[in-house]
């Protein structure tokens, strides 16, 4: 798949951040978990009741979404319709389900 232009990538990344936000809100409501979501530009911050955070942001030069969680730092690159971890091949929403569940202290399934 050829690289996208910066504007194409930013539009795609914004759409994905919107989807992540809606998915996290729905999962948190279903599990009665307290997760505060804030966004500034291409950076999304999820703050949990225990004070921990997950930061998700787009990196246009690398055409990746980066996730910083208590479990570590992760880079996801678009592969068709999915975002795949550049190190272990894991899918973004499966990975986020694990990170969010760990930090929320409740089982949440995203995506």
From Swiss-Prot:
It comes from the Bacteria. Belongs to the frataxin family. It comes from Cupriavidus necator (strain ATCC 17699 / DSM 428 / KCTC 22496 / NCIMB 10442 / H16 / Stanier 337). GO terms for biological process: iron-sulfur cluster assembly. Involved in iron-sulfur (Fe-S) cluster assembly. May act as a regulator of Fe-S biogenesis. This is Iron-sulfur cluster assembly protein CyaY. The keyword Transferase does not apply. One of its GO terms (molecular function) is ferric iron binding. GO terms for cellular component: cytosol. Keywords: Iron, Metal-binding. NCBIfam families: FeS_CyaY (TIGR03421). HAMAP family: CyaY (MF_00142).
């Amino acid at each position: 798949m050829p690289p996208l232009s910066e504007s194409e990538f930013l539009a795609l990344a914004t759409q994905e951040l919107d989807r992540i936000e809606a998915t996290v809100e729905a999962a948190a409501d279903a599990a009665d978990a307290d997760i505060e979501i804030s966004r500034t530009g291409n950076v999304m911050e999820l703050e949990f009741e225990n004070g921990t955070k997950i930061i998700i942001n787009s990196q246009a030069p690398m055409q990746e979404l980066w996730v910083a969680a208590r479990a570590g730092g992760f880079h996801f690159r678009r592969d068709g319709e999915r975002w795949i971890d550049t190190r272990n091949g894991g899918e973004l929403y499966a990975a986020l389900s694990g990170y969010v569940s760990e930090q929320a202290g409740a089982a949440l399934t995203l995506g």
